[in-house]
Amino acid sequence: MIQISHLQLSLQRRLILDDISFTIHEHECLGLIGPNAAGKTTLLKCLSGMIESDRGSITMSSRSIRQHQQSIGYLSQQTDFKPWMTCEQSLRFFGRLSGLDRATLNKRIPAVLHEVGLHDQQTEVIERLSGGMRQRLGIAQAILHEPTFLILDEPASALDPSGRHDINQLILRLKKRMTIIVSTHLLEDAKMCCDRFLVIKHGKLLGPLDNQRNVDQNRIQVETLTAVPSFSATRFPRVEIDRINPCCYQFSAQQPLDLSQLAITLIQQGWSIASIAYQPIGLEERFLDMVADV
């Protein structure tokens, strides 16, 4: 378990991280989300040990994170590859800088390339790789020394839907043996691999955003088996009714609606209801609501 307690950091007299506290559980993938300049990358660099905070503590298994540097893997938002190197050469170069010996690298390089789906590109020059392949190579570099804590900064931000899907599937596989934190603004994609999300803005944690399907009790969508006949809107005072199509209507109000009472009223008016349900609230909508007033 990784425990972050009352973390605070100022740079050039500007408060960047303000009393940050949270926990990352073992084999959890935690998503860190927030608008630009919220402090996400700075927080991740503190977790990696690259930046030391002014105050607070970061512990891993009850010991300072600085005593676990060999257990941490880090992928920055912009990975600096040498484009003329092959995938194998790049990993070998990075591995030697990290203190891994030749025998270990001979064993680990084929293994990590296979794990990230680049075993057929082992001798491929990096400049010929797609964006998604480069990101997977970056993750291969981050896990080369077999860390137990993996930090990923926007790993899928510049990728197409297929590339983002591949990265999220890879993260799902990795979290079976690692604890992971990933910063992202691609919420609907990241919910595939993240167990929960924390929202940060202006260096402060606004709170958790769970990865559950929430509903808006102020909006109800009704689908019918046949086109809806004329009905009396006066039965629904202070309710806005939108006709999506002849067999689909949305009811909206400023206050929570009673779903069962609405169903009874519609049936009494001759509606043949196929389904009636509160409208789901997406992660992005909940995130925008959370940061709007801060």
Indicate where each model-derived feature is located:
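Conserved ABC transporter NBD signature motif
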Residues: S53-H68
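Catalytic Walker B motif of ABC-type/P-loop ATPase nucleotide-binding domains
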Residues: L150-E154
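ABC transporter nucleotide-binding domain
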Residues: I167-Q250
